[in-house]
Structures are given as structure tokens and as C-alpha cells.
A protein has these predicted regions:
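Short beta-strand element of the alpha/beta-hydrolase
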Residues: 25-33
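Conserved alpha/beta-hydrolase
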Residues: 43, 47-69
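Catalytic nucleophile-loop/oxyanion-hole region of alpha/beta-hydrolase
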Residues: 66-91
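Gly/Ala-rich beta-loop-alpha elbow adjacent to hydrolase catalytic centers
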Residues: 101-109
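The alpha/beta-hydrolase serine catalytic core
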Residues: 107, 119-162
Length: 162
């Protein structure tokens, strides 16, 4: 059975993590996609694979995802990036690691190179979605929708069923 834990991001804000520490010199860090969590097939498979091969494994649920603190609609790329950075600093410290990112997780993984370029030994992007906000959303908004975004600092998109 998989054992999830929590780490305090701030005084009253907990992030749910999956940390399989096997005393390896390498850690595989899995970063999930938008509106996903650590209970999907990819993170659970990678965790089992790492255990079988005696490699450390780490994953987390960003704010507003899974069972971590906060509401999804209050999340931003910057907040989620900082969640990842915090957990890596707290758990992995100065050790080497490999990032596996799925969709949004690949984008967040790429951003980690700005802070951990000497520690990251590899990167695997699965269905990588860097800058999906610009191409898939922003460019399709009408001018009045963009104006509303700048005035209110957010714009509520109609759901496409996802």
C-alpha cells in the first residue's frame, strides 16, 4: 500500500507528498498534470519502479490539487512552481535528481532548472504543456475577455467538460 504524507509549506498550509527514500544517490521527482494528483497510474507506477530498482522517489500535490491545501482557482503557475521548489529543497536538499513531468508538471519541471540546474541530471516530459495558457487559452480569448482579465485580474472560462 502506498503511504502518503504531508509537509508544511507554511504554518497552516500542508502539501501532500509521496516520498520513498531508499538511500540512493538519485531521486526521481514526478510532477503531475493540471487538476491531477498522485493517485494516478503514472506516479504510482513510477514509485513501484523506483522501489524495485532501489532509487528514491518523490512526488507532491500542488496547492489546490488532490489533498493539498487551498482551492484550485487560487492557484497560479508561480505558486505551484514554488510548491515544487520548496519540497525539493526540503526533501532532496543538495542531492541529484531526475524530473519526470506530465503535462503541466513538465512545465513546472522545466522551471526548476532555474533553481536547481546543477542538481538536475535529466528531464522527461510526458505530453509536455509549456506555455499552454498562451497558445490554448490567451490567443483564443476575445478582446473584451482580455480586458475583463486585466480589470479583475482573472477571467472565468466556461467549462469544456474537463
Amino acid at each position: 500500500m502506498t503511504k502518503f504524507n504531508y509537509i508544511y509549506f507554511k504554518k497552516d498550509k500542508k502539501l501532500r507528498i509521496l516520498n520513498s527514500k531508499l538511500n540512493s544517490k538519485l531521486t526521481v521527482v514526478f510532477l503531475h498534470g493540471l487538476k491531477s494528483d498522485m493517485e494516478g497510474k503514472k506516479p504510482l507506477f513510477l514509485n513501484r519502479y523506483c522501489k524495485k530498482n532501489k532509487v528514491n522517489f518523490l512526488s507532491l500535490e500542488y496547492a489546490g490539487h488532490g489533498k493539498s491545501y487551498g482551492k484550485f482557482e487560487n492557484g497560479t503557475i508561480s505558486k505551484w512552481r514554488n510548491n515544487v521548489k520548496f519540497v525539493i529543497r526540503k526533501i532532496i536538499k543538495k542531492e541529484k535528481f531526475l524530473i519526470v513531468g506530465s503535462s503541466l508538471g513538465a512545465w513546472l519541471g522545466l522551471l526548476q532548472f532555474q533553481d536547481f540546474k546543477k542538481q538536475i541530471i535529466g528531464f522527461i516530459g510526458i505530453g509536455s504543456a509549456p506555455e499552454f495558457l498562451d497558445r490554448l487559452i490567451w490567443q483564443k480569448l476575445k478582446n473584451n475577455e482580455k480586458k475583463q482579465f486585466f480589470e479583475k485580474k482573472f477571467y472565468l472560462l466556461k467549462s469544456d467538460g474537463y
